[in-house]
Amino acid sequence: RPEAEPVLLLSLPRQLTNIPPYAACLGVSDDGHPLLIRLPSPDVAHILIAGATGSGKTELMRVILASLALTHRQSQLQIVLIDPKQRGLAPLAGLRHLLAPLASTPEQSLALLERCITEMERRDHEGRSTPRIIIAVDELLDLIATGGKAVEAALTRIAQRGREAGLHLLAGAQKPSSAALGSMLKANFPVRLVGRVGSVEDARVAAGVS
């Protein structure tokens, strides 16, 4: 838009007469209509948001999570927050939908991921997928760098098998290359939302075409 205008999150659901289950708001289109993304869709499942510092990727993560919390009860939706820097997702730490307190250390994060895997396996056995669990990870590369192979393996397992059990990853990263993420984990993010990056090559890496 020639002139940027603020968009109030609370106003977006009011513009819709019927919001599909587990549909999150991304913002508005050029003509002012709400943009939605439905997590259970086969071509969605997990979302990777890429962009340089200050590009708004963490703000978009917060919008997605807050919009889901606004339109779903705790019996329908649970949220896991992993934030190594304890800044980006901290404003959501008071949500009643949280499965556990916000995790910031590698040990806390791995314990939460393993708890989610246990739940995923239980659901596979029972054949259920609700309540949906959104696992939000800010600064994904920092988490993998500090948590090592155990954290990467846990994330990859959830990315590969989580959708049918109702588990969805929502992650933010500055430059999500295969070398940094691991090729298997990166391949299991069907949706890539790319903000401002430092170069054309960074954009290609973030979008998964390089």
Where are these regions (language model features)?
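P-loop NTPase catalytic phosphate-binding loop
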Residues: 12-208
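Interdomain "pre-motor" coupling segment immediately N-terminal to P-loop NTPase/helicase cores
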Residues: 1-11
